[in-house]
Amino acid sequence: VMQKKGMYLGGYRPFGFLSDPNDCHKLILDPVASRYVRLIFELALQGNRTGTIAKILNKNQIPTPAAYHVAENHVYSEQKAWDLQRSHWTSGTVYHILKNEKYKGTYVGAKFIMPVPCKHRVLRAPLEQQVRIEDSHAAIVTPEEFEQAQKVIMLQHGKHQAGNYTKHQYPLKGKVYC
């Protein structure tokens, strides 16, 4: 019910957002981190590959999402803080930011399903079962910029990495063994 209203229920907020101090289920822009996300999209729209963007961010010492959380004192242990301070941008981190619809203001929920109750295996839910709410929170990029970035990613990485395929579900998987 809360997801269908576009209320944010996740644990960690996406990089570039903060929880609204008046309502923890709403996202507001983080004035610093949202600029970093905006930069990532701008670099992608200029035709840069995700690996090139990661190198640019590392060269300019832009903190990774994990390192940014450490700097903002959202750390649970000294060991974790030490590990995260050594973190660096990767093409995978950049790719996941560019694919996240939250940056265009769209809430996407119920993305995963558990086909067998009490089993700890989850699968990506079909698109028609996912909850999608446009303009549920402030956007860092316009929907047009987001869609253009998706086209750039598809040209550079192809359909496989972009996640446009579904894994076949065998009905006897996990039940019959050879």
What is the meaning of each model-derived region?
Residues 1-177:
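Conserved catalytic breakage-reunion loop centered on the nucleophilic residue
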